[in-house]
Amino acid sequence: MNAVALIQRQLDAYNARDLDSFVACYAEDCVLAALNGPVAETGREALRVRYARTFAENPDNRTTLLGRIQLGDIVVDHEDVTRGPGRERFQVLAIYTVKNGEIARVDFAK
């Protein structure tokens, strides 16, 4: 699967709040971090815990893709995230690094 297809698959799983399919897109030793900042999570199990909480606390959570660019194994998404009616809404850049058909790292800017 190419990098763009993988990122789309994880975005679709995120929007469906399908935790197993979402986590399956990530490498066992994946890293989530703030762009030019601290690492937020390391490893698939930490990712599972984080997003299980996110999905439980935000049942109407939805991300809309505003734009996407790719350069090799790097995919950058511009996303609009809505937590639900009357809840927090924000835009984010998600910079995905894909290795061996899995997401190895995501750096977020918001």
Language model regions located:
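Short, aromatic-enriched amphipathic alpha-helices that serve as compact interaction elements
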Residues: 1-17
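Short, well-ordered alpha-helical segments enriched in acidic and aromatic residues
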Residues: 16-31
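A beta-strand edge to alpha-helix "cap/lid" segment located at domain peripheries
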Residues: 2, 15, 33, 39-41, ...
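Alpha-helical elements of Rossmann-like donor-binding domains used by nucleotide-donor carbohydrate transfer enzymes
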Residues: 9, 21, 46-50
